[in-house]
């Protein structure tokens, strides 16, 4: 495994972050395809054994059970100081409504720490932009969470570049803890972030940790092949349903290059993303140990300039999606 500094922090993180939305009791939350604790622990242990030290969960994943599972597994399989644990706040969980008001943030971090069984998280991220709360209120509350020692750093996720720029400016002007990461929607078939968000992050020294690096599985298998999760993934359909014809052309080239190199489609798609300036650690998901191992090995795959161009040439502008 390779490691890289997470933006302007002192954290050294693995080049892959294990996304933990897959982990959670299936009868809790909105996803019936999540893995129960016993199966989840096998994946988390394999990740740690494979050198992954960066884990991303959220208060809302499976009604909080993802945090519970991740916390127990990390305590059993690693020392706390050896791992970087990130969680999020915004979406509704239990009787805690959606939002980023000061009371919601302060209660949410306490609930997350209780579920994780930890004194602090390394990274607390706002899951989305809250249009119903003044951003100043949100940013000051996040700063107080950092000052209280409950989160070492804060990050953001999926918002418009002008919103992120405004937040960074307000943090500087008020001496508040800055956003050090941007968790955004970025992969071979969705590259709209290259227009404004990625240059902004690069200029400000903000680490990019993309979600859906494999387009929710679309870049891992023959185009058009379905899975149970793909069929039931209503959010995923909102991301890619309008651009399938163009995306299929990119997937064809991906398959050709993967076959030519003797590696998998997923490994090529991750290698492409890992080569992008500012991208520190794509957030991967896995439901089987062999699947995770395949992704871990992607870190050692390199692409030539010609292969990069071959993958990128068919891309056409997409509707901006993923902010809700």
Predicted regions and their residues:
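N-terminal binding-site loop/beta-alpha segment at the start of enzyme catalytic domains
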Residues: 1-83
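Conserved beta-strand positions
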Residues: 18, 57, 87, 123-126, ...
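Active-site mouth loops of central-metabolism enzymes
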Residues: 24-38, 92-103, 132
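Short, acidic/polar
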Residues: 33-47, 100-116, 164-169
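Acidic-and-aromatic substrate-binding clefts and catalytic sites of carbohydrate-active enzymes
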Residues: 58-67, 92-93, 130-134, 161-162, ...
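Acidic (Asp/Glu)-rich catalytic clusters
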Residues: 73-82, 114-117, 146, 168-174
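Active-site groove signature of glycoside hydrolases
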Residues: 114-133
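Beta/alpha (TIM)-barrel catalytic core signal, keyed to glycine-rich beta->alpha loops juxtaposed to Asp/Glu
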Residues: 133-313
């Amino acid at each position: 495994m390779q490691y890289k500094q997470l933006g302007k922090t002192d954290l050294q993180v693995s080049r892959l972050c294990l996304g933990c939305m897959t982990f959670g009791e299936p009868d809790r939350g909105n996803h019936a395809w999540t893995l129960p604790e016993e199966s989840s622990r096998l994946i988390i242990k394999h990740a740690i054994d494979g050198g992954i030290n960066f884990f991303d969960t959220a208060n809302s994943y499976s009604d909080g059970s993802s945090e519970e599972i991740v916390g127990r597994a990390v305590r059993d399989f690693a020392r706390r100081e050896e791992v970087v644990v990130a969680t999020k706040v915004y979406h509704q969980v239990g009787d805690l409504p959606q939002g980023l008001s000061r009371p919601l943030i302060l209660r949410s971090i306490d609930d997350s720490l209780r579920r994780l069984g930890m004194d602090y998280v390394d990274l607390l991220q706002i899951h989305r932009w809250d249009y119903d709360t003044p951003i100043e209120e949100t940013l000051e509350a996040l700063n107080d969470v950092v000052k209280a020692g409950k989160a070492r750093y804060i990050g953001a996720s999926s918002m418009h570049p002008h919103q992120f720029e405004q937040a960074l400016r307000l943090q500087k002007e008020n001496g508040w803890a800055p956003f050090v990461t941007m968790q955004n929607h970025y992969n071979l078939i969705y590259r709209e972030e290259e227009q404004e968000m990625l240059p902004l992050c690069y200029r400000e020294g903000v680490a990019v940790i993309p979600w859906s690096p494999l387009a929710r599985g679309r870049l891992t298998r023959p185009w058009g092949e379905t899975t149970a999760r793909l069929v039931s993934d209503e959010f995923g359909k909102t991301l890619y349903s309008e651009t399938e014809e163009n995306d299929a052309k990119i997937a064809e080239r991906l398959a050709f290059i993967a076959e030519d190199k003797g590696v998998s489609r997923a490994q090529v798609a991750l290698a492409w993303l890992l080569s992008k300036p500012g991208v520190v650690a794509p957030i991967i998901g896995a439901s089987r140990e062999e699947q995770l191992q395949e992704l871990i090995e992607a870190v050692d795959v390199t692409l030539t300039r010609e292969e990069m161009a071959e993958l990128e040439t068919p891309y056409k502008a997409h509707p901006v999606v993923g902010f809700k």
